Amino acid sequence: MARKDKDNGPEFVPLTNRSHRSSASFSSTDSLSSDGSLFGDDDVNALHSQKITRTQLPEENPYRDDDVELERGDNIFSRPTENSKRNRGSRLIWVVGLLCLGGWILAFVLFWGRRNSELSSSIAAVHGADSATGSTSYGKPLTLDGVLNGSWGRRRHSISWVAGPNGQDGLLLERDEDEKKAYLRVESIHSRQNQTDAREGWVLMESGAFAVNGKSLQPSATWPSPDFKSVLVAANAVSNWRHSFTATYWLFDVDTQTAQPLDPDEPKGRIQLASWSPQSDAVVFTRDNNLYLRKLDSDKVSQLTKDGGKDVFNGVPDWVYEEEVFGTDSTTWWSKDGKYVAFLRTNESMVPEFPIEYYMSRPSGKKPPAGLDKYPDVRKIKYPKAGSPNPVVTLQFYDIENAEVFSVNVSGGFADDDRLITEVVWASSGKVLVKEFNRESDVIRTVLIDVPSRTGELVRVDNFAQDDGGWAEVTQSTTFIPADPANGRPDDGYIDIIVHDGYDHWGYFTPVNNSVPVLLTSGPWEVVDTEPAVDLANNIVYFVASKESPTQRHVYSVKLDGSDLQPLTDVTKAGYYDASFSIGGGYVLLSYDGPRVPWQKVINTPSNQNPFEEIIEQNEQLSKMIEKYALPAEIYQNITIDNVTLQVVERRPPHFNPVKKYPVLFWLYGGPGSQSVDRRFSVDFQSYVASTLGYIVVTVDGRGTGHIGRAARTIVRGNLGYWEARDQIETAKAWAKKPYVDKDHIAIWGWSYGGFMTLKTLEQDAGQTFQYGMAVSPVTDWRFYDSIYTERYMHTPEHNPTGYEHSAISNMTALQQNVRFLVMHGTADDNVHFQNTLSLIDKLDMAGVENYDVHVYPDSDHSIYFHNAHKMVYDRLSSWLVTAFTDGWQQGNSVLPVT
């Protein structure tokens, strides 16, 4: 499904919800912009470059503060006097009366002004509306156009730290789109402050355009060789799935500033993936699902595999492995010594195809035969639904010296149809760590393969099916730690996430075949599953965790022996931080994402005795905008349901009046391991609803979500939707009792998993608490979703048929008890298939249910962008909600035809 960890207010996220995944794939309101001066991977997705215009909404807010306005009707101020010769006594009485009335009015206004001021101050003090949103009550209302077009997006830079050829730390790769210095260069972080000499800088590409045989090319992405002598350049990139793309590839020589095709025999060939050897002497790449090798000392290209094609992938993932396992376009891994290449061979010949039909466009690029242009373009995707055959994956190795492909069998492994390979990490001396999951993702086998000797052994087994009945999370955060006897590390080892006392923590396994870790972290809090940074010289590990609160993220350090846990960020204040460390761990790009206006700076780490600090970004434009707009207050609090403490955020309109009654909109995602309630700065659709429409918006992260411990997270296994819906309903009941809430106007909405949860909540509640709902791209039956994701949380349909029946949206009578609900879906959704919505409509038809609306977006995928569709989604959500909260649907249902 599409995920999002919420990044600047995304409305939907992939079902593959892991915090280390890029959130920028398809974010409905994520409008991050990145300055080209500091960059990482090039973005080949141009979704957010689209300009979105605002739909006109009613000028007046139906819930403005009418109750504090003076009446202006038939009174003394407007009534004409009947006798112009009134005596002075009468006038004096009127004057005194007016003065008293005026004094009373003034006192009333001052009282409420002071009360509201005290309320705002209390919110700021208690809940940290140190959140920038909540600090302004006066100004212009937000516009939907401004929210959608990126005006409120924070500027955020990514630094691509690189290792110097001679081990220098603090080197970064920079791209300058304006080419004021050079298009692509490597320089020391100190050179930005003129603190270094020229030898610590390399100009890699002087210009962003380069010519080959008289044809000018523009880079889509660039990867310098480790020795900085060449640059691998992708041009003419065309997106495939969420992360993958194809392009023409070129080898750019730094000395001569000239380029040649990666494969001289096929310069126009579309390549899926290419990567440098650690020694900079070769490139391995995949084309047409076969693996090739180009050594730089020759123009010859060697074909390593020959079985690749429609059903077999070598070195790149198929759809489900890209979406649900690796979150990237690569399943190719060079050994550290450059002698071997490990790659995944994926055979999906037994995986059924699912057709995606395009009615308005032709993504295939193929012109139909004459007379057939009225038929849709059809793309068939190998998509394993729950219970269907999975692709069969095997780990293969290529021996560079002997030009041989082989595999290593480790006894006791899972059968072909019961095996997922989720992580491959090279160690030293030709050894590699491999994680294998069973199909239902509740048993992990970690094996250590000695590639030169072609042997392997089982080093760890994590059996969650027996331990707590939960699932194993897919991560790519295992970090190899090389031996250094002189520095207290006699053996190789690795850092990995482990479960300790019901929470995710870091463990250090040394030697690599040791199954008992050194515990690096512990306690009733959890670490973020992004790869930790390691300062090998000082045996220090840096990581991000939610130690202070589930809604916060801070950066910490700990020694490899598990001692001296220290915060790197200010934990005395609510904060949400991210960090990117230099290769040697001496510098860090610290990114503060909220609750105040985001900023970024590069600093030295505590082990680096050379003080350094440079502010990279302050988002001054956001600070200026905040002063001009009336933003909602965000009140963070907890709610306890069934003895489980859950995180809640309530967004109140800027001119909130506690004596009024406000409609309430619940927004949720709610997928396993996800998180929507956090302290990031965000001005999104929810902000617009509170600021401009004047409604309260509430989000609760229910059971099943992230950073609340495994007991509360894994309780949802086998019956997705039940506990999550219960938490939404119980929270809504609590809000319905609040004196400022209009309990007859409570709605819920979500996208993707949030769409499923919207329908499941409406079904389970049956109109008792919620009256309205809006579901976008929802799953309606988990048998329709992909196997790897679904079976992780639901087991297989064969093992859990009852759970699948219960989790499906099936009680149409219950849905009929709601006043009205809305369902929207893109017809070309390759993630959550349109089949889900069609199945729901069929059930509604058979039950004779009519209290719903449907909007379909032709040729739109899960993000719903095609042909202005994204704007239309939010226009429809907004106008539909206004109609609901002004009783438009109830009035419409009561209209009878004239006879």
UniProtKB/Swiss-Prot annotation:
Glycan-linked positions: 149, 194, 347, 409, 513, 638, 643, 811
EC number: 3.4.14.5
GO MF annotation, one: aminopeptidase activity
Vacuolar side: 113-899
Broad class of where this protein is predominantly found: membrane
Subcellular location: Vacuole membrane
Compositional bias annotation for Basic and acidic residues: 61-74
UniProt KW keywords: Aminopeptidase, Glycoprotein, Hydrolase, Membrane, Protease, Serine protease, Signal-anchor, Transmembrane, Transmembrane helix, Vacuole
Positions with biased composition (Low complexity): 22-37
Active site: 752 (charge relay system), 829 (charge relay system), 862 (charge relay system)
Transmembrane segments: 92-112
GO biological process, one term: proteolysis
Main function: Type IV dipeptidyl-peptidase which removes N-terminal dipeptides sequentially from polypeptides having unsubstituted N-termini provided that the penultimate residue is proline.
Protein name as annotated: Probable dipeptidyl-aminopeptidase B
Naturally occurring in which organism (per UniProt): Talaromyces marneffei (strain ATCC 18224 / CBS 334.59 / QM 7333) (Penicillium marneffei)
